[in-house]
A protein has these predicted regions:
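Helix-to-loop junctions at the C-terminal end of transmembrane segments
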Residues: 79-91, 302-315
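Cytoplasmic membrane-interface "Motif A"-like loop-to-helix N-cap segments
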Residues: 88-100, 311-324
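Conserved MFS/SLC helix-loop-helix module at the cytosolic interface between two early adjacent transmembrane helices
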Residues: 78-117
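Cytoplasmic helix-loop-helix junction between adjacent transmembrane helices
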Residues: 122-159
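C-terminal transmembrane helical hairpin of 12-TM major facilitator-type secondary transporters
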Residues: 316-365
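Helix-breaking motifs and short loop linkers at transmembrane-helix boundaries and internal kinks
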Residues: 59, 91, 112-118, 129, ...
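Glycine-rich segments within core transmembrane alpha-helices of 12-TM secondary carriers
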Residues: 152-176, 198-199, 383-393
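Extracytoplasmic gate region of multi-pass secondary transporters
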Residues: 47-48, 248-307, 359, 363, ...
């Protein structure tokens, strides 16, 4: 962990005692939080695999599935702010425990839906339950870590969510292949039960493991608590601004539109890849699960390489724009590759990895685009616009699939959306508008 800390200049130059303090904090908090991010993502993605079997049992059309996949984000958007306000009142430990227990119970309860409308209601409740989890964790980190550590710690948490995509496919395939009929439950029911129950257990564990703030911990010494308090209190505070001023900032909405386009593509990957793979003529659930992990494996590698290149060259726009265009081109070519399973899998993996990799690339832009006073409010609005894409894009994909019987047209539409986002980025967010260019690095 000390080697990891050497990546952060402010910490690397600190005395060994300070380095030991933050190594201790990271070893205490990060394993739990990364595991929480993994189960969080799995409990979202599992629906895409359950659909392969549950559609016949509950008469779930592709249009209804698209609504169910998207309405999750509506519940999330509506209850995100109240959840964050609640966290400020009662503390992180109670809030994170409450969120994990509720989303775990809703996931398990989804195993017992018998109609499409019940599934849609369950997904809305899941969005309500999860609301505030990601921003709550980000806020929690500000209590424990100085700014020089929080950036890459956040990236590590996002990478943990990506690892869930690698885990969920093979895990779902094994559960649905070997546990059909176990304890009287069908394969898709066992999937929801066995992916939701660990979340409940982890939430209970979090109640005893997490501490709201450093000064309340019994695993830090008095000197270590003093060091953390001193480091965090010495950081310059953000300049205040009225939220109304943030809402009048055009660049925020331009960035929000770009994120909307990116999120439309990445969400389509998350919820429709297993269905797309089965459309290649493959029916074995274990094989589908293994192939569904490929885009996430490629995405993890691409995220690292693209992020490193973007940081080295201090260039954001073309890295992101070209990544989006590669994803869009791969999606558009899928229809032409019908009948060629190997080429279809290659295009699916490349396009999906590009769509997923675009997300961390995008989040290097808002902090550089917005002024310090408006960054916090602007980023929140941009995030909400992205979540709105989760609602609309999946309803659109489901409707197209129901109307045409094919996913290829839906992926063509998502390709056009991603090209639109790339053009908006490159035309309306000029390089000189970003504050972290190479010439400002010196």
């Amino acid at each position: 962990m000390n080697d990891t800390l050497s990546q952060y200049p402010d910490i690397a130059s600190a005395d060994p005692g300070t380095r030991r303090v933050y190594a201790k904090v990271l070893w205490r908090l990060m394993p739990f939080l990364m595991l929480a991010f993994i189960v969080n993502a799995i409990d979202r993605i599992n629906l895409s695999f359950a659909k392969l079997r549950m559609a016949e049992d509950i008469l779930l059309s592709d249009a209804a599935y698209g609504i169910g996949a998207g309405i999750f984000y509506l519940g999330y958007i509506l209850f995100e702010v109240p959840s964050n306000l609640y966290m400020q009142r009662v503390g992180a430990r109670r809030t994170i425990t409450r969120i994990m227990l509720l989303w775990g119970m809703v996931t398990v309860a989804t195993a017992f839906v018998t109609t499409a409308n019940q599934l849609i209601a369950a997904r809305f409740l899941l969005g309500m339950a999860e609301a505030g989890f990601f921003p709550g964790i980000i806020l929690y980190m500000t209590y424990w870590l100085p700014a020089s550590l929080r950036g890459r710690v956040t990236a590590g948490l996002l990478m943990a969510g990506m690892m869930a995509g690698i885990i969920c496919g093979p895990l779902s395939g094994v559960i649905m292949t070997h546990l059909d009929g176990w304890l009287g439950f069908k394969d898709w029911q066992m999937l929801f039960i066995l992916t939701g129950a660990p979340t409940i257990l982890l939430g209970i564990f979090g109640w005893f493991w997490l501490t709201d703030r450093p000064e309340q911990s019994n695993w830090l010494t008095a000197e270590e608590k003093r060091q953390i308090a001193q480091d965090i209190c010495s950081e310059p505070g953000a300049v205040g601004s009225h939220f109304g001023g943030v809402l009048r900032e055009p660049r925020m909405y331009i960035a929000g539109l770009v994120y909307f386009c990116i999120y439309s593509g990445s969400n389509t990957v998350t919820y429709w890849i297993p269905t797309l793979i089965r459309g290649f003529g493959l029916e074995d659930l274990k094989l589908i699960g293994m192939l569904a992990a490929l885009p996430f494996i490629v995405a993890v590698c691409a995220m690292y390489l693209l992020g490193r290149s973007s940081d080295r060259h201090m260039e954001r726009r073309w890295h992101l724009g070209l990544t989006m265009i590669v994803g869009a081109g791969s999606f558009a070519l899928l229809g032409l590759a019908q009948g060629n399973v190997v080429l279809s899998i290659f295009l699916m993996s490349l396009g999906s990895a590009a769509a997923l990799s675009a997300i961390p690339l995008f989040w290097t832009i808002p902090p550089a685009l917005l002024n310090k006073a408006g960054a916090a409010g602007g980023i929140a609005v941009i995030s909400s616009l992205g979540n709105l894409a989760g609602v609309l894009s999946q309803a659109a994909v489901g409707s197209i699939k129901s109307a045409t019987g094919s996913l290829y047209l839906a992926f063509d539409v998502m390709a056009l959306v991603m090209v639109l986002g790339a053009l908006v980025l490159l035309i309306w967010i000029p390089a000189h508008a970003l504050k972290d260019r190479r010439d400002s690095k010196a």
